UniProtKB/Swiss-Prot annotation:
Location within or outside the cell: Secreted
Name used for this protein in its record: U3-lycotoxin-Ls1a
Annotated tissue distribution: Expressed by the venom gland.
Family: Belongs to the neurotoxin 19 (CSTX) family. 01 subfamily.
Source organism phylogeny: Eukaryota, Metazoa, Ecdysozoa, Arthropoda, Chelicerata
Signal sequence coordinates: 1-20
InterPro entries: Spider_toxin_CSTX_knottin, Spider_toxin_CSTX_Knottin_CS
Positions annotated as propeptide: 21-44
């Protein structure tokens, strides 16, 4: 019986050690992947079109706001035949960002009160 107990403890110890090493490998891979995606995002961020600027050359190049990506909106000016495209933020997304900011500030106040 002592042998079975000793063997069980040894088996659990080896299993936990191998699990910890596998998790470390996964964490390292996740960190490498995260760093590469951040570098790609920074490289892509330099090429984006700011809000209210012309985006007719690339309609998917609008910059991101705090939470959402701006949308390339095209329209015909009054009395004009040429289409004009600019990066704009839709109103419903603007209101959602404002609500998220207010909720974040309110959450910070609650954390201060009870923190």
């Amino acid at each position: 019986m002592k042998f079975v107990l000793l063997f069980g403890v040894l088996l659990v110890t080896l299993f936990s050690y191998s699990s910890a090493e596998m998790l470390d490998d996964f964490d390292q891979a996740d960190e490498d992947e995260l760093l590469s995606s951040i570098e790609k995002e920074e490289a892509r961020a330099k090429e984006c079109t700011p809000r209210f600027y012309d985006c007719s050359h690339d309609r998917h190049s609008c910059c991101r706001s705090e939470l959402f990506k701006d949308v390339c909106t095209c329209f015909y000016p009054e009395g004009g035949d040429n289409e004009v495209c600019t990066c704009q933020q839709p109103k419903h997304l603007k209101y959602m960002e404002k609500a998220a900011d207010k909720a974040k500030k309110f959450g910070g106040k609650i954390k201060k009160w009870f923190g």
